[in-house]
Design a protein with these regions (language model features):
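Metal-dependent catalytic neighborhoods of phosphoester/phosphodiester hydrolases
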Residues: 1-11, 24-45, 130-134, 162-166
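Active-site-proximal segments of metal-dependent phosphoesterases and phosphodiesterases across multiple
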Residues: 2-14, 116-148
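Generic structural signal for hydrophobic
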Residues: 13, 42, 109-112, 143
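Conserved beta-sheet core of the metallophosphoesterase superfamily
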Residues: 17-20, 132-183
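Structural recognition of the beta-strand scaffold that forms the well-ordered cores
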Residues: 19-24, 48-52, 71-75, 117-121, ...
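Active-site environment of divalent metal-dependent phosphoester hydrolases
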Residues: 26-39, 56-61, 79-83, 125-129, ...
Length: 183
């Protein structure tokens, strides 16, 4: 399955206060030549982009400040998906590092930016899975225990559980908003 939509879809978000998009999604490799084009187009529409590696391979969050509060968003795609749907066209890479490497990147940022609220958007779990994977719950707790403000998950195409852990939100699966629920 490949996913594609018209750039006109972005017009639906023109009145939104703030729009950010993670590109850490296994379907980004359906059209590898379009990843940078998509990121540039989104940025040109004042939409924050995160979840793709920089040209030098580094992982940077999308950062912004609102009402004196700084925010940073990191995106990650479970490497299981990118190993089966790879980018063989160019060197553009979505963030799909092993969890320990990704955690070190995020937690180094947290340490260097103690006043910034850091969130992680995780593309994980299996299609149509109802249950939260124990390793994902453990990883979300690990991130929160070390200073991340919240963890948001997606990919299973159906809502999954959520919890408030140590006063911070974890949403394991958002479900579908713009895809048919039959997927």
């Amino acid at each position: 399955m490949t996913l594609f939509n018209s750039p006109k879809v972005i017009d639906a978000f023109t009145d939104a206060k703030k729009v950010i998009v993670t590109m850490a999604n296994n379907h980004m490799y359906d059209y590898p030549s379009k990843i940078q084009i998509t990121a540039s187009y989104l940025r040109s529409k004042n939409i924050g982009v995160f979840g793709i590696c920089e040209k030098d391979g580094s992982v940077l969050p999308f950062e912004y400040e609102e009402n004196g509060i700084k925010y940073a968003y990191f995106g990650h795609c479970w490497g299981l998906y990118t190993r089966t749907n790879t980018n063989n066209e160019n060197n553009v890479r979505i963030v799909d590092h092993d969890y320990d490497i990704f955690a070190n990147i995020v937690l180094d940022y947290v340490k260097m930016n103690p006043r910034t609220k850091v969130y992680c958007f995780m593309h994980w779990n299996y299609d149509r899975e109802k249950l939260i994977m124990p390793m994902h719950r453990k990883f979300a707790h690990y991130l929160i225990d070390r200073g991340v403000e919240g963890v948001i998950g997606s990919h299973s195409h159906r809502p999954q559980g959520a919890e408030i852990y140590k006063g911070k939100p974890i949403v394991y699966g958002l479900g579908n908003f713009y895809l048919p629920s039959g997927i």
